[in-house]
Each structure stands twice: as structure tokens, then as C-alpha cells.
């Protein structure tokens, strides 16, 4: 009888709960591509979306899905990480307000509260966007809302959120009957980048 080599086990920490951005990983799992490569891949949703790169650097996982701008911050902070691939080739991040809010332009954020989920790069993206409208981060109050981007807007805990994905939160908000208005970083002073 033929002997089968043991499969290599790979733990992948996701950047967020499973969503359409992870489609290549889900498809590979469900169609047996990982099996064909002799891999047992475990996808793990994070308790905190800022932790996957730190956990991978601490050897608590083999791979972490993260954001390109966040990787640059982590490398600058000397985390032992290496980029191995791309899942999403263009920005998904956006600054979102409720469509019926008084905020019509980014300049209207002066004195307002902005929620975020991953510190370090979302505030940098927001800072660059604010600068194109004559504001700085000192002109807004930042609040970590973790995974509750849309709910924090609905509950009026924040006036805007940075880090909402245009292909997820905006659709979720429409489904919930609370449509959003998005400002895209690449249209407000941030160079285009690969999201995941």
C-alpha cells in the first residue's frame, strides 16, 4: 500500500470575521486545493482585528492576513514579518458616515468623533484624508469601536468610521436600511495600495 506523507498544518489568522475578502481561501478549502497541496489549513477569526500580525510575529500562527499599510507600520516597529501574497489588489478602506448625516464633506468632521478598529494605520489614513481638507487628527476625537463599525454609527456613538470596507459595511448598511456615504482614501490624498 502507498504511504501518505503527513499533511503540513498551517494556521491562518484572518484580519476580520470571515467575509467575501477571504474568498480565495474559502474556495481553496472547499474545492480541495489545500488537500492537493498536502496542507491542512485552519482559518481563525481574530478576537481583536489589530492582533493577527503581532500573533504571527510571536509564532502563535503561521500566516496573518493584514492590511498593506499596517504591515508597513509593523515592519517599521521591527516586527519580524514578511509579505507573502495579496488577496485584494486595491483599497477597500473608506471613511463612512450615515447618508442622512450632516457630514457632507470631510471638512465637516471638525469637532466630530471618528470610530476605528485597527490603530496605527487607520489613524494615518484618516490623518492624510483630513489634511486634504485643512484638518488634522487633533480636529477629531478617535474612538476604538473594534468590530462595531456600522453599529457604532447607528447608535450615534460616533459620527464617522474609518476602516469600513466599501464591499462589506456599505452593503450591510444598505441591507439594514441605514445607508452610508463613503469617502475613499485614494480620492483624498492617500496613494492607492493593495488592501489585503
Indicate where each model-derived feature is located.
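Short beta-strand-to-loop elements that line the ligand-binding cleft
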Residues: 40-48, 65, 137-148, 182-185
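Short, well-ordered beta-strand elements
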Residues: 6-18, 39-45, 111-115, 141-143
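Short helix-loop capping/hinge motifs at secondary-structure junctions, enriched
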Residues: 35, 99-108, 135-137
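Short coil/turn segments
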Residues: 15-19, 89, 98-102, 117-122, ...
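Pocket-lining segment of extracytoplasmic ligand-binding domains
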Residues: 69-70, 148-196
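Pocket-flanking alpha-helical
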Residues: 21-29, 44-82, 92-104, 122-129, ...
Amino acid at each position: 500500500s502507498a504511504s501518505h506523507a503527513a499533511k503540513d498544518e498551517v494556521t491562518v489568522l484572518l484580519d476580520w470575521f470571515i467575509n467575501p475578502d477571504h474568498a480565495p481561501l474559502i474556495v481553496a478549502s472547499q474545492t480541495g486545493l489545500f488537500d492537493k497541496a498536502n496542507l491542512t489549513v485552519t482559518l481563525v477569526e481574530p478576537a481583536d482585528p489589530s492582533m493577527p500580525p503581532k500573533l504571527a510575529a510571536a509564532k502563535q500562527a503561521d500566516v496573518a492576513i493584514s492590511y498593506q499599510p499596517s504591515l508597513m507600520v509593523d515592519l517599521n516597529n521591527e516586527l519580524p514579518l514578511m509579505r507573502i501574497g495579496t488577496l485584494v489588489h486595491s483599497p477597500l478602506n473608506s471613511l463612512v458616515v450615515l447618508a442622512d448625516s450632516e457630514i457632507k464633506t470631510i471638512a465637516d468632521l471638525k469637532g466630530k468623533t471618528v470610530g476605528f478598529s485597527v490603530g496605527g494605520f487607520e489613524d494615518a489614513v484618516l490623518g492624510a484624508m483630513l489634511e486634504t481638507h485643512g484638518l488634522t487628527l487633533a480636529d477629531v476625537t478617535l474612538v476604538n469601536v473594534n468590530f462595531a463599525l456600522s453599529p457604532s454609527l447607528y447608535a450615534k456613538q460616533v459620527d464617522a468610521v474609518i476602516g469600513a470596507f466599501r464591499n462589506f459595511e456599505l452593503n450591510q448598511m444598505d441591507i439594514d436600511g441605514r445607508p452610508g456615504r463613503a469617502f475613499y482614501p485614494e480620492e483624498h490624498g492617500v496613494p492607492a495600495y493593495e488592501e489585503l
